[in-house]
Amino acid sequence: MQTTRRTFLSAVGAAAALGAAGGAKIPESLAAEPRAANVPASSSEKVLFWVAACTPCDKNLKFDEELYKDLLAYLKANGADGVVVLGTTGEFPSFSVTERKKVAETAFKHRNGLNIIVSPGTTNFPETLELSLHAEANGADGLLVVPPFYYRRPRLDGLTKYFSMLFEQVKIPINLYHIPFATGVPISHELMHAMEKYPNLTGIKDSVSDPKVYQDFVAEFPKLNMRTGTTENLKYALDHNMGAILAEGNNFTKQIAAVFDAKRAGKDLTETVAKLEAALKLLRAGGVDEYGPMKYALSLQMGTRQFYQRPPNSDVTDEQKTKIKEALEQIKQMG
């Protein structure tokens, strides 16, 4: 996982009870007022904020459906337009195909107006297609598809055939996922151009922090939604009427939503982006750069029992817990 980009919503109270009983409702003090009017959540709407949602497990490392329901409600209440289900932050490689279907079905059941993009990618085409068709049949608004990984440097013709097979069998909007530091397989401009013949090519998620890489994507494909996956490129994305899919949205839903609200209101983004970056810096310094600490911080923010993750991702340490609580308190003082 890239530097795990999470932190805190300004409405968060001080450290909430970790031992809250299962399926706790969102504390009223943490739930932001819904927007006066929902932003259209169609896949053709570009300037939307998707959270790359984490996937909570219980202490026995089973998918925690109740906590996931609470998480979706929390993200919606604090301003998210949509979520990506089982992306990198959602730990998709840690779940079986059957489990991934259950997680997606839980999201569909409790979407409450959220735009839902499912990440169905695997190392092989049959399972990727199976998960894609399942998402399509159950009401997904779109897909975010990672390239097949493990094989070293597959050629353009092989990747073109792989994605063409998918586009020819799935009709909902499809976005390609550029995260080469994790997959070893970049999404090239040539591959994107090869897919442009399919009308349901919607765009990408670019999770590379390099501004030039992202800016080149935007310049080359201005009609598609070239969503940024990093806060470093957020202002540039919004300045060019593109969306974002952000892992930081788990812990910073409200702050990121404020940036999008400023964009929609035609306001200058400098102040809201600076406030977001300051809060991000504090929690990152507090140790939230792994799944365990990120999920621990989120459980404090939501006031629920602890979110767990599966190995090989490590549990949060006592030292990290202390630092996270201190960072959350500092962020609270920022207002």
What positions do the PLM features span?
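Flexible loop residues that form catalytic
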Residues: 13, 54, 88, 148, ...
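Signal peptide processing junction and immediate N-terminal pro/mature segment
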Residues: 24-35
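Structured C-terminal cap/extension of enzyme domains
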Residues: 16-18, 238-335
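N-terminal secretory signal peptides and thylakoid transit peptides that target proteins
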Residues: 1-15
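Alpha-helical structural signal in soluble globular domains
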Residues: 102, 106-110, 134, 138, ...
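Active-site beta->alpha loop and helix N-cap motifs at the rims of alpha/beta catalytic domains
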Residues: 42-50, 56-57, 62-184
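Catalytic alpha/beta core domains of metabolic enzymes, predominantly
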Residues: 182-277, 283-287
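N-terminal carbohydrate-binding accessory modules
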Residues: 34-43
